[in-house]
């Protein structure tokens, strides 16, 4: 899922340590659509309308055990499909299963396992020789090459292989003065979906990821998961208002 720099969203304010941030407040402007309907809202990201095509988005960095609730009070408990293998996230593939056992093999704590899997993907994978084709988790486990999409689906598959519900998140991430379209992983720990990014391998993320949508990729062609993103490309402005 590499759209290139041509689709990047530039911002005026620089972030010196984006992935160490605890909270960031953004103002987003979207031409021709309502950002409240486009950007995901939940315990880690609150989206509030500020008028026609404008919204304020507050993103919180979270870790398991923190008390956070969705602004609308709705539950986001994992579905069966968040734990089951499918055509893109083959958590029952022998290579995926074997790889999942290589990290934190004797550990039972789900968060420790998830972080170890994130680090495993980060350390094993390379971006050399990647193609524009969306690879499945089974293919990535064998090639160990790919961009953010391949990192995300492999980590999701490894987590499910260790009985941790997992899905992918699609949105934007800050990088050197601009936001790039990006994919990462979310794992369900305790009663909270916690984001992980295997391209970073930091044991969680800060507040510099803006989530548009999430998907367990069940029965979906890759293009279907990306539709909400394609609708905003070239139409989005982002302003960083406050950083903690």
Annotate the PLM regions:
Residues 74-79, 119, 123, 161-164, ...:
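Active-site rim recognition segments
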Residues 106-183, 187, 204-207, 220, ...:
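Active-site neighborhood of thiol-dependent amide/isopeptide-bond enzymes
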Residues 10-16, 150, 196-201:
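Intrinsically disordered, low-complexity boundary segments flanking structured domains
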Residues 1-71:
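Intrinsically disordered, low-complexity N-terminal segments that are enriched in acidic
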Residues 2-10, 17, 21, 86-102, ...:
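A short, charged
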């Amino acid at each position: 899922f590499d759209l290139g720099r041509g689709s990047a969203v530039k911002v005026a304010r620089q972030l010196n340590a984006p992935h160490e941030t605890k909270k960031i407040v953004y103002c987003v402007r979207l031409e021709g659509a309502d950002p409240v309907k486009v950007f995901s809202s939940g315990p880690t990201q609150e989206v509030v309308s500020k008028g026609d095509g404008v919204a304020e988005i507050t993103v919180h960095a979270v870790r398991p055990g923190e008390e956070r609730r969705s602004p609308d009070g709705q539950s986001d408990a994992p579905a069966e499909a968040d734990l089951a293998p499918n055509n893109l996230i083959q958590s029952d593939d022998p290579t995926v299963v074997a790889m999942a056992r290589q990290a934190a093999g004797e550990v039972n704590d789900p968060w420790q396992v998830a972080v170890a899997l994130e680090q495993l993907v980060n350390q094993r994978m390379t971006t050399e020789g990647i193609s524009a084709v969306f690879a499945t988790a089974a293919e990535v486990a064998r090639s160990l090459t790919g961009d953010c999409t391949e990192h995300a689906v492999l980590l999701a598959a490894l987590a499910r292989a260790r009985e941790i519900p997992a899905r992918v998140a699609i949105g934007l991430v800050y990088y050197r003065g601009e936001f790039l379209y990006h994919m990462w992983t979310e794992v369900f720990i305790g009663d909270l979906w916690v984001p992980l990014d295997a391209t970073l391998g930091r044991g969680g993320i800060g507040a510099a990821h803006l989530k548009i949508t999430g998907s367990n990729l069940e029965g979906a062609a890759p293009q279907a998961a990306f539709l909400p993103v394609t609708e905003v490309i070239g139409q989005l402005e982002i302003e960083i208002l406050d950083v903690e």
